[in-house]
């Protein structure tokens, strides 16, 4: 199994590796934190379970999604990440942090709090262990992202803001 991951967090990775023996993490991209992640994975002795691709473009991205069982974006600072939408369009079930901007728009992505490593590990474990669950999120996610329009996304975000303002005024 493979899991495409973005962001930090060593604990959930170790928890998943303890529960699912044949999982591999694929980390795509190149950023300020990548060197830290590579060193940390080596320190933990789990480097053999990781593949660091560097920056991917075009067809490479689609190929990576085709090889993935789960896409994980536990980012706390992603205003509106497009990569979860790309994963869903490729038929890959998606796990994102509630704190990411895209969480407000998507219904068929598993959402966990960025700091809740147990919930993140449980979500990955669930999708890898129960194929029917993964297939449901993949198919519903594909339907959702295919029908996603920016006007609908903006309306959802506007509703969230209105709810927050209304709660603050009460």
What is each PLM-predicted segment?
Residues 132-162:
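A charged, aromatic-enriched C-terminal amphipathic alpha-helix characteristic of glycosyltransferases
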Residues 1-12:
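Single conserved hydrophobic/aromatic residue that forms the stacking wall/gate
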Residues 93-96:
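Short hydrophobic beta-strand element within catalytic cores of glycosyltransferases
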Residues 76:
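Aromatic "clamp/platform" in nucleotide-sugar-dependent glycosyltransferases that forms part
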Residues 109-118, 126-131:
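Conserved acidic donor-binding segment of nucleotide-sugar-dependent glycosyltransferases
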Residues 55-56, 63-68:
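Short alpha-helical donor nucleotide-sugar binding micro-motif in glycosyltransferases
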Residues 36-56:
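Nucleotide-activated donor-binding/catalytic signature segment of Leloir-type glycosyltransferases, i.e.
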């Amino acid at each position: 199994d493979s899991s495409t991951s973005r962001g930090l967090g060593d604990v959930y990775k170790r928890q998943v590796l303890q529960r699912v023996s044949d999982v591999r993490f694929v980390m795509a991209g190149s950023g300020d934190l990548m060197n830290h992640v590579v060193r940390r994975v080596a320190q933990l002795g789990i480097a053999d379970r990781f593949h660091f691709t560097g920056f991917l473009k075009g067809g490479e991205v689609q190929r990576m999604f085709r090889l993935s069982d789960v896409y994980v974006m536990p980012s706390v600072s992603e205003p509106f990440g497009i990569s979860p939408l790309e994963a869903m369009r490729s038929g890959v079930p998606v796990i994102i942090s509630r704190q990411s901007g895209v969480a407000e728009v998507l219904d068929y992505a598993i959402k966990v709090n960025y700091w809740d490593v147990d919930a993140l590990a449980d979500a990955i474990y669930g999708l890898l262990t129960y194929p029917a669950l993964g297939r449901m999120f993949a198919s519903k996610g594909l339907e959702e992202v295919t029908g996603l329009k920016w006007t609908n996304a903006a309306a959802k975000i506007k509703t969230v803001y209105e709810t927050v303002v209304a709660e603050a005024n009460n």
